[in-house]
Regions:
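Mid-domain Rossmann-like dinucleotide-binding core that forms the NAD(H)/NADP(H) cofactor-binding site
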Residues: 109-110, 116-118, 122-207, 211
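Cysteine-cluster motifs in flexible loop/terminal segments that predominantly coordinate metals
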Residues: 40-42, 52-116
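Glycine-rich phosphate-binding loop and adjacent beta-alpha segment
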Residues: 177, 194, 204, 231-278
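Glycine-rich beta-strand-centered segment in the early N-terminal region that forms part
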Residues: 12-64, 68-69, 77-79, 122-124
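A residue-level detector for short acidic-glycine micro-motifs
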Residues: 2, 33-37, 160
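Conserved amphipathic alpha-helix within the SDR
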Residues: 209-219
């Protein structure tokens, strides 16, 4: 199980969640038991699987519409109360008192995951190397494929190139982006960004982001700007480098309740869109 930055927000109290709890939603491992009533034939004891940080019910209005990222029961039961769909947690202390689960509570030795939230992984891939698939990789893919609806030949910028941002670079390049610009404050991350698909890099500490991106794009700005940190400053950067008709796709979760300013007239007159993706 990996440790996501949102886990750190919960640990620090910036994201409210019941306590005591077990965190961890970047999971992969081996099935040791199948619950009663399991109907799917794709899963078997001894099989390696990767889990998804979202655990959609598969039955609500959002799930039926293909928007499992908006699953109402998941957010009402798990994210607010720390329980699974039967209203119960699977974790307790030695005295039998409940310990709440953030997603599946993957940092425990064993975890219970709904069948809708796991997928088999090939035998030649180890669980250690595939734990990231259900969070950083899935979040990045959803942002590029569904959030931005990236089209071949478009220009892309990624503001903040950590775990999710780096995966966005890779997916954007694979899906046909003509330019992929990485923006960060860390030169080491920007060097790594080149290996993930970035065609250009900008250090936000030493370079004016808008001027640099406008020069790289012949004065137009980027068609899609992804914001992967969840801070007002990076929101402003992403909006500031956006082309007319462009889409800004924020992915990063902020620490607690934060707000970013949006220039109303520019957004309206230039037909720019802000499309959240989770």
């Amino acid at each position: 199980c990996g440790l996501c930055h949102s886990d750190l927000h919960v640990l620090g109290g910036a994201i409210a969640f019941p306590t005591p709890c077990v965190l961890g939603h970047e999971v992969s491992g081996t099935i040791v038991e199948l619950g009663p009533g399991m109907l799917t034939g794709e899963l078997a004891v001894g099989q390696n699987v990767a889990g998804a940080f979202l655990m959609p019910c598969g039955q609500c209005k959002a799930c039926r519409a293909g928007r499992d990222d908006l699953c109402y029961p998941f957010f009402q039961l798990n994210r607010l109360k720390g329980v699974l769909y039967d209203g119960e947690t699977r974790l307790s202390d030695r005295d039998g008192n409940p310990i709440w689960m953030y997603s599946m509570g993957g940092l425990a030795e064993y975890c219970v995951v709904p069948a809708t939230s796991v997928t088999p992984i090939p035998d030649n891939l180890s669980p250690k190397n595939t734990a990231i698939l259900g969070c950083a990789a899935m979040t990045a893919y959803g942002a590029v494929r569904r959030g931005a609806d990236l089209r071949f030949g478009e220009t892309v910028a990624v503001v903040a190139t950590g775990g999710v941002g780096s995966m966005i670079l890779k997916f954007a390049k694979v899906m046909g982006a003509r330019q992929v610009i990485a923006l960060d404050v860390d030169d080491d991350k920007l060097t790594a960004a080149r290996t993930m698909g970035a065609t250009h890099t900008v250090n936000l500490l030493t370079t004016n982001a808008r001027e640099a991106v406008m020069e790289m794009t012949d004065g137009y700005g980027v068609d899609v700007a992804f914001e992967a940190l969840g801070r007002p400053a990076t929101w402003n950067t992403a909006l500031d480098i956006l082309a007319d008709g462009g889409r800004m796709v924020p992915i990063g979760l902020g620490a607690g309740v934060q707000s970013a300013e949006v220039q109303i007239n520019r957004t309206v007159r230039r037909s720019q869109s802000i499309i959240g993706s989770y």
